[in-house]
Amino acid sequence: MSRRRFDCRSISGLLTTTPQTPMKTENFNNFYTLTPKELGRGKFAVVRQCISKSTGQEYAAKFLKKRRRGQDCRAEILHEIAVLELARSCPHVINLHEVYETATEIILVLEYAAGGEIFNLCLPELAEMVSENDVIRLIKQILEGVHYLHQNNIVHLDLKPQNILLSSIYPLGDIKIVDFGMSRKIGNASELREIMGTPEYLAPEILNYDPITTATDMWNIGIIAYMLLTHTSPFVGEDNQETYLNISQVNVDYSEEMFSSVSQLATDFIQSLLVKNPEKRPTAESCLSHSWLQQWDFGSLFHPEETSESSQTQDLSLRSSEDKTPKSCNGSCGDREDKENIPEDDSLLSKRFRFDDSLPSPHELVPDLFC
């Protein structure tokens, strides 16, 4: 099976509606002050913190190049804008504030999520920072956001801890889903089949070049829940080939040692999602009714100010580590070669995590896995 090349001019599944947000041509710098804080960087985009000169409000400015690999990719950026507009009423999707356009770039002014990526909560060194009760709340909010997208026939296709932000870190804030550069519209007559996404988060159907459905996002939610609860990435191998083999064979460690501090209901939830056949995965809507998500301690969830002094000490530890861990991107950098989440110092990170988003096509690495 030959690899389908990424081509901005021929990708299916893009929203073609004209964005409702005005594309301003005024000088962005006349209205916003860029701070030194860079939130993310990719091959074709950079995200930086900015401050409105008129209100003093903080935002995330995402600078997207319109030409990539010599191709005009403006339609891809307009698709991302259209998805953000479609989800504007969803509290768990990052909010689009304004759009500016220059001769070479389109600038998205996005809501600023001060809590950073939930990836930081997946680090083994911060295992004591978040309880299973906290994870329940975060997963529920992710499901609510994804359910909203799926109701509108949008699949995200790159859900991962680096693309889910928090409104604040202490108290633990609300979920904001970002990075819609790989999202696609489904449900039309033509099937959507593409090799896309971050390697260790790819679903089996993407590796097999099978039709993409909303179930692909559900696989990723299973991975996110696994990482938040075990602080380990379930499928990453010692090399690229092993990673794809683990995914294809659904090699997941559910050992007592790995899940010693995880409830049986949480384990059941993950196991229901990490199944090879996408038709057997529950939908986002049905997941919201799972027994695990009903096990809430409402006191600790809605009264974070009453948490113990030790929790505040843990928060200080997290704040200190944030300087060494990946910063939030507040949106897609629009290409599978982006490395916006590679940390400057990986000494804190478990060897079970990888950050290379630019791996070759899985079909080039392990052709014997696919029929």
UniProtKB/Swiss-Prot annotation:
Compositionally biased region (Polar residues): 309-319
Residues that hold ATP according to the record: L39, G40, R41, G42, K43, F44, A45, V46, V47, K62
Subcellular location: Nucleus; Cell membrane; Endoplasmic reticulum-Golgi intermediate compartment
Post-translational modification: Autophosphorylated.
Function: Acts as a positive regulator of apoptosis. Phosphorylates myosin light chains.
Stretch list, region Disordered: 308-345
Disulfide bonds: none
Protein name (database record): Serine/threonine-protein kinase 17B
Domain Protein kinase: 33-293
Family: Belongs to the protein kinase superfamily. CAMK Ser/Thr protein kinase family. DAP kinase subfamily.
BP GO terms, sorted: apoptotic process; intracellular signal transduction; positive regulation of apoptotic process; positive regulation of fibroblast apoptotic process; programmed cell death; protein autophosphorylation; protein phosphorylation
GO molecular function terms attached to this record: ATP binding; protein kinase activity; protein serine kinase activity; protein serine/threonine kinase activity
Assembly behavior: Interacts with CHP1; the interaction induces CHP1 to translocate from the Golgi to the nucleus.
Taxonomic source organism: Rattus norvegicus (Rat)
Result of changing K62A: Inhibits kinase activity
Tissue: Highly expressed in thymus, spleen, and testis, lower levels present in the brain.
Xref: PROSITE patterns: PROTEIN_KINASE_ATP, PROTEIN_KINASE_DOM, PROTEIN_KINASE_ST
Catalysis performed (reactions): L-seryl-[protein] + ATP = O-phospho-L-seryl-[protein] + ADP + H(+); L-threonyl-[protein] + ATP = O-phospho-L-threonyl-[protein] + ADP + H(+)
Pfam families in alphabetical order: Pkinase
One Gene Ontology cellular component annotation held by this UniProt entry: Flemming body
Root EC class: transferase
EC code(s) of this entry: 2.7.11.1
Primary location: nucleus
Alphabetically ordered keywords of this record: Apoptosis, ATP-binding, Cell membrane, Kinase, Membrane, Nucleotide-binding, Nucleus, Phosphoprotein, Serine/threonine-protein kinase, Transferase
Residues the record marks as active site: D158
Keyword Kinase assigned: yes
